[in-house]
Structure formats: structure tokens, C-alpha cells
Amino acid sequence: MGKRMSLILGAFLSVFLLVACSSTGTKTAKSDKLKVVATNSIIADMTKAIAGDKIDLHSIVPIGQDPHEYEPLPEDVEKTSNADVIFYNGINLEDGGQAWFTKLVKNAQKTKNKDYFAVSDGIDVIYLEGASEKGKEDPHAWLNLENGIIYSKNIAKQLIAKDPKNKETYEKNLKAYVAKLEKLDKEAKSKFDAIAENKKLIVTSEGCFKYFSKAYGVPSAYIWEINTEEEGTPDQISSLIEKLKVIKPSALFVESSVDRRPMETVSKDSGIPIYSEIFTDSIAKKGKPGDSYYAMMKWNLDKISEGLAK
């Protein structure tokens, strides 16, 4: 009986050690991958489209949350400290307002343009116009697909610099991704060119569509200018309603990452319906419409053009 028990125990230990070794091997293989951190779901999705499974990727701001103001979790601090490369938007997004990202990388002892990089580098910046934010950069450059292409090229450039052994994969994926975005951009311009000029007005909660407006020739109006200021005050709401009495657009839109109630008040008091939810600061959860940068931009372009054409 003792001998049999020894054999069973020996077999068990052999299996245990085999599993443990296998597990350790997997862990080591994973740790060999480039450790990449992106500040939000949009940048993370672009990075994933270019890098695929060649990297370990962590996105800081959860899907559906506001990247302007965020309190990093312990996991975010750990991942940032251990990252080989960090991608952030810049131009007054994560480094505006309470500057949560600036504090995060400082505490992690990371260096700009060595460890962390602004993916917006090289875009033509548009500036805010409101009294409290006048002269500050408008961060929402990705809402112009041409800027999304610049973001993607900046991401690929740093991935290649940090991980040259996978250069061929990054270049191949970038080429396919850029072609896809260029095709969508061309289709969007045709759609908006076909809409009558007197119907062209995007009305949103946050004034985040300036880059979109410039790219596709559609002016914008909003309740508040940027999410770092007061949002949906009575004065902001009444000011927009007065404008809408003159302009009379056919539809309103509300962003997925903001409180719907201010726009619902505008809709009720103006008699103008909310046509659709749209995406600005975040992609959608996996499996939902808008669950990638490409998908969210296609959704926005389709819904806005449909709403304005009514």
C-alpha cells in the first residue's frame, strides 16, 4: 500500500511540475513581448490594429469613461511603471484639466519622447474659443480620419523603434489599416457633399466636433465646449436653445461618454429630436456597434449624415 501511494504521489508531482514548467514557459514568452500602455480605448484600438498579438497592451481609461478627467487605478500605475512604450493623445486631453496623465508618468519616472509619445504629433491643432478655455488646444483630433491616419503612423513608428524584430508585421498592418481609413474618409466626404448646405449642423453636448467640421464641411454647435469645464448648466442649455430657434436643425446628437440629460432637456425644450448616440471619447464595448476606431467613425459618419439629411 505504501509503495502504491509513493507511486501515485510521484506521478502527481511529475504532472504538477510539468504543468508548472509549462505555465512558467508561457509567462516568460508573454514577458518577451513589448509592454505597451495606451491612455484610452481609441488609441489602444489603433495600436492593436497595427501590432496585433505582437505586444502586451493595457488601456488605462475604461471604455465609456471620460479621458479628460480620470483617477488611475493601482493596476494603471503598475502597468505604466513597467511599460516599454506609452501612447497618449496630448493636446489638452489627458494632460489638460487635472493633468492626471502628467502626474502618472512623473510618478512612474518616465521621460517624454523616450518612454511616452503623443500620437497627435504633426496634426494641425484647432484651438478652443470659449471664455474659460480660450486659446487652449482642442484635443479631439481623431474625429477627422486624416488625423486618425497620422495617429496610426506615429504609433507604428514607435513600435518599430522599440521592437524592430516585428517591423515587417507593423508595416504590413499599418498599410492595410491606413488604406481602410482612407477609403472611409473618401466615402464620408462624398456623403456630406451631397447634403444641402442649410441642413449641415452637428449639435452635440460637448463641442468636440471642430476637427470633424473642418474635415467634412459641417458646422457644429454644442452645450459646453470641453468636458473639463462645467457641463450642462442652465445658462449653457438656454444659450443653445436660443441658437436652435434661429438655425432649426433637423436632429440632435448625444455622445456615448457624457450624461444624456442636458441634451434631453435641449430636445424637449426645442422640439428637435435626438437622432442618435454617437462616439467621441471612447469606442463601444466589444460586440456592440462602434467597438473599434474604424467602427465608431463609420457609425458617426453614417448616423450624422442620415440625421442631417432628414
Swiss-Prot record:
Keywords: Cell membrane, Ion transport, Iron, Iron transport, Lipoprotein, Membrane, Metal-binding, Palmitate, Signal, Transport. This is Iron ABC transporter substrate-binding lipoprotein MtsA. The keyword Iron applies. GO terms for cellular component: plasma membrane. It is a lipid-anchor. GO terms for molecular function: metal ion binding. Changing H140A: 60-fold decrease in affinity for Fe(2+). 100-fold decrease in affinity for Fe(2+). Part of the ATP-binding cassette (ABC) transport system MtsABC involved in iron import. Binds iron with high affinity and specificity and delivers it to the membrane permease for translocation into the cytoplasm. Has low affinity for Zn(2+) and Cu(2+). A lipid is attached at C21 (S-diacylglycerol cysteine). InterPro entries: AdhesinB, Bact_metal-bind_prot9, Lipoprotein_PsaA-like, ZnuA-like. PANTHER family: HIGH-AFFINITY ZINC UPTAKE SYSTEM PROTEIN ZNUA-RELATED, METAL-BINDING PROTEIN HI_0362-RELATED. GO terms for biological process: cell adhesion; iron ion transport. Pfam families: ZnuA (PF01297). Belongs to the bacterial solute-binding protein 9 family. Lipoprotein receptor antigen (Lrai) subfamily. A lipid is attached at C21 (N-palmitoyl cysteine). Residues 1-20 form the signal peptide. Fe(2+) binds at H68, H140, E206, D281. It is found in: Cell membrane. It comes from the Bacteria. Changing D281A: 18-fold decrease in affinity for Fe(2+). 100-fold decrease in affinity for Fe(2+).
